[in-house]
Amino acid sequence: MAKQQTKRAQASEERDDGLREKMVAINRVTKVVKGGRILGFAALTVVGDGDGGIGMGKGKSREVPVAVQKAMDEARRKMVKVSLKDGTLQHTVVGKHGAASVLMQPAPGGTGIIAGGPMRAVFEVMGVTDIICKCIGSTNPYNVVRATLNGLMAVNTPAEIAAKRGKTIEEILG
């Protein structure tokens, strides 16, 4: 059952607005009431523009398609921009959320995306082509995606680092 959910969760599509969508996880949840159980679904999705834009959303509903649509809409509303350099990150960064930690390292061209599960979905829709990642601690999809986004928001361009240090970009790059 888990393998079927995983394959279904990897379904990706591109809409007419040019954004890439990927479903990360679908959970079946139950609420126990006096009359029995009430089934529901929770969906976790990521949306990206293929050029450093990324958004994460979660949706809940009694039916899977409605939950997925809610998650996609939330992901579109919460999109943020990350600066990339030749299809990879500017520098090594660690992202944390709860018990999940994600180590992300830039990689030379041709390496590909070396990342597992939820992290891979984030990088594919975001437009990253070369990266090396390791998930440490919790492997809960929601926490891993949040940790990945927290790490990506901490990426600085050489211009931002130079401005913080009061130096020129040439001094930073060496």
Curated annotation (Swiss-Prot):
Alphabetical UniProt keywords = Ribonucleoprotein, Ribosomal protein, RNA-binding, rRNA-binding
**Among the entry's GO cellular component annotations, what is one?**
small ribosomal subunit
Q: Pfam families attached here?
A: Ribosomal_S5, Ribosomal_S5_C
> Annotated Gene Ontology MF terms?
rRNA binding; structural constituent of ribosome
Q: In terms of domain of life, where is this protein from?
A: Bacteria
Q: What InterPro entries does this protein's entry cite?
A: Ribosomal_Su5_D2-typ_SF, Ribosomal_uS5, Ribosomal_uS5_bac-type, Ribosomal_uS5_C, Ribosomal_uS5_N, Ribosomal_uS5_N_CS, Ribsml_uS5_D2-typ_fold_subgr
**Gene3D superfamilies referenced in this protein's UniProt entry, alphabetically:** 3.30.160.20, 3.30.230.10
Q: Where is the S5 DRBM domain?
A: 19-82
Q: Which GO terms describe its biological process?
A: translation
What PROSITE patterns does its record include?
RIBOSOMAL_S5, S5_DSRBD
Cross-referenced NCBIfam families, in alphabetical order? rpsE_bact
This protein's assembly is summarised as:
Part of the 30S ribosomal subunit. Contacts proteins S4 and S8.
Q: What is known of its domains?
A: The N-terminal domain interacts with the head of the 30S subunit; the C-terminal domain interacts with the body and contacts protein S4. The interaction surface between S4 and S5 is involved in control of translational fidelity.
* Sequence similarity: Belongs to the universal ribosomal protein uS5 family.
Q: What does this protein do?
A: With S4 and S12 plays an important role in translational accuracy. Located at the back of the 30S subunit body where it stabilizes the conformation of the head with respect to the body.
- Per its record, how is this protein called by name? Small ribosomal subunit protein uS5
